[in-house]
Amino acid sequence: MALRACTENESTHTHHTVNKQRKNSAPHPLQGKKTGAASAQAAKGGHQSAPRRFGRMKPVKAKWVTYGLGFLAVFAFFTFVYGDVIERAEQSMYISTAPETMQYLLSQPHGHLFYASRWVMLLCKWAPLGAAFLALVMTLTARAFDYAFRIPRSLRGIGFAVPVAEMAWMLSRGTNLYYKNEPSLIVLIPLVALAACAVLAALVALVKRCTKSTAPAALAVRPWGALLALLMVGGTAVTALKVNENVILTARFPNLADRQDWETIISEAQKAKRPTRAVAAYYAIALEETDQLLNHMFDIPYDFPKLQLDHFDGSEEYGLFVMDCNFHAGLLNPAYRAAMDHVVMNGPRVFAYKRMALCALLNGEKALCRKYLDLIDRMPFEHDFVERYSAMLDNPKLIDSDAELSHVRSLYPKESKFEQNYQQPSFLGYNVGLAQGSDRTLLTSAAACLYSKDMNAFLVRAQIMHQKGMPFPTCMQEAIAVAALKMPQALEAFPEVGKFVPDEVRAFLIDAKPYVEDREALRQNLKERWLGTYMYYYYTENNDPSQTRKDSEATPGSKAGVN
């Protein structure tokens, strides 16, 4: 009995202890609500795959962002960086539905392929439209490449390496991209690359469908591929602006000249770091068209870099500008011949047809002009040009209202000589060697003599200007002071020379003395202070041994001289 009572007491004590513990562990009513809310929040958070982090996107959104940014980057490149290049390339071809006008192209290997791609190339007549097309093609290429090679979601956009490689090829070709080569390769190569990547992507999709493989669950990703695409395209753009500055200007200036935007040509040429001959030539044309030739002619450096041009007919670098320079010098027949030579040697080009049409118009050859206008009108989107100059053909008085054509008329030669009587190129040799001309021609002739460093011929023209009471720009005064170093009587013959100009020449010679044995050091160390003066040009620039000649020693028809 005693044992039973003891057991019952122990059991009762244990029961009370457990109940006390349960009572102590029971939550307060308010505490219970708070804990329940926390549990619900924890349960809700448990459905999230990962904590929210900066830069993570859903795969679909990341894909659109990546390829959208890539598209915009490529579009910006072909609009704002290489827009003038693709526009000039479009003008450097010819396309029509008339088989007889396309025989030159169709008879070549792959001619029919080039014929088809030239129709697509017409989109590049307007840089934004051509840029949009190229950006679309290149973006689709990048998408197909990423899919075909199973690029991870976070790196999608690395496929823009293919378009960037195409753009790098364009940069490496420079002016050769369209000059005397097939310009439609600009659109043909991207289209071929798209077709190749699309075929690979289709094969991968077919294999994937046959194997019935299931894709893993889509997780949020960081679109590193978008950053890579922007860096690649941006790096290409910076390279183009730095390395291919002259390539861009060589394409841009003829486009601006067609619109008669001379002031833009002048301002951009003066900003160029090291202009080529082509850039300097269009700069001179713009100065001449705005009556500023002798005032600003030497404001740019004339240390011409060597161009890497494909060799075809021997007129590689000069073929870029000699046609337009002859035209704007009033030499219509040499300009016409240069355009014709380009067509014969390199096939039909619409820009050459346009120049020949204008030469025929100004020469009064109406039938010939109509022939070229008809050829131009067969090419799509050129009707505005044809309509404008057809009106002048029917009413010659309209020519006088055109600033460019009336300016060219004012420079017509007044002496009858064959082109072979002058040094080449014609526009330079004619102005150095002419014996008579108008007052406007006298100015261009004086400028040509200064450029050629032919001081004897220059002094003859300066004497005529003195007799006519014409003002002497600063460069002419400096040139006379330079000539006076060997011919002191020159200063006495020209009272127009300011009294401080000879002092400026002597100051230049003092600065030049330490570098007289090193032509490159002479040029670089004196450039900051003296660029823009004739002394700097005469002693430091355009003085490569292969480019110089002694005053008045070149024989007629030779190619000697500074050019």
Regions picked out by a protein language model, each given a short descriptive name:
Residues K63-W64, Q103, A127-A135, P183-A198, ...:
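Alpha-helical transmembrane segments of polytopic membrane proteins
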Residues V243-K417, P425, Y430-N456:
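Soluble catalytic regions of membrane-associated enzymes that act on cell-envelope
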Residues Y82-A89, W169-E182:
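Juxtamembrane "helix-exit" motif on the non-cytosolic side of transmembrane helices
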Residues T79-V120, C124, P128-L129:
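Membrane-interface coil-to-helix junctions
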Residues A218-N244:
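Internal/C-terminal transmembrane anchor helices
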Residues A135-R153, M167-M170:
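Transmembrane-helix motifs of polytopic, lipid-linked glycan transferases
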Residues M121, K125-R143:
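Hydrophobic alpha-helical transmembrane segments
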Residues V74-T79, A161-G174, M232-A237:
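Aromatic-anchored segments of alpha-helical transmembrane domains
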